[in-house]
Amino acid sequence: MQAQHCLPEEEYDMLKGKTVLLGVTGSIAAYKIAYLASALKKLHAQVHVLMTQNATNFINPITFETLTGNKCLVDTFDRNFQFSVEHVSIAKQADVVMIAPASANVIGKLAHGIADDMLTTTIMACKCKKIVSPAMNTNMYENPIVQDNLAILQHYGYEVIEPASGYLACGDTGAGKMPEPEMLLDYILREIAKEKDLLGRKVLVTAGPTQEAIDPVRYITNHSSGKMGYVLA
């Protein structure tokens, strides 16, 4: 599967030194995240994968450990962790988090602040941008409860990727397909690119009071101290 990206080649180094967390939940689409993890690693990102226990029924954690070079995190109380509060430690490193595929169950947990496994506790501790890619049966996706939960996540700053429509693993046809890995990668690249919107640009900042002439004698002015301009500069 060859990924084709919308950003120019010279901008691919934007992931160098960046940490991406991938949250994988129980869905048949979980196998696609192996392609995404591999693509991120090739672009020099530091990639950490967190899985729910249900996700391990669809893809083995060893797959992600091989592709990323990092331990795949599943169990909150794993005895092999280094001495640190692991979910907080990983959360602090993250520049962006993507939950894909995101099941109805995990979407509901995140929307209502339920943190009962490694994935949800880590996401609750993250202050970076969070992207959610729902993947489920059409009837589940269109369920008003799921839609309300997605709206709640958007209210709290999550970006929700609308699922594609097509033939689903259950045999139905409709909305609920997770987008292909290359599209998910583009979402991550665009998010990281926002940090560098002004990179290499020259910006002129003016500070202090201004004067606008009414006629040769009178003018309108203000009492601005210029402190805000100095802070911005």
Task: Say what each PLM segment does.
Residues 2-131, 137-226, 230-233:
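A cross-family phosphate/adenosyl-ligand binding-site feature
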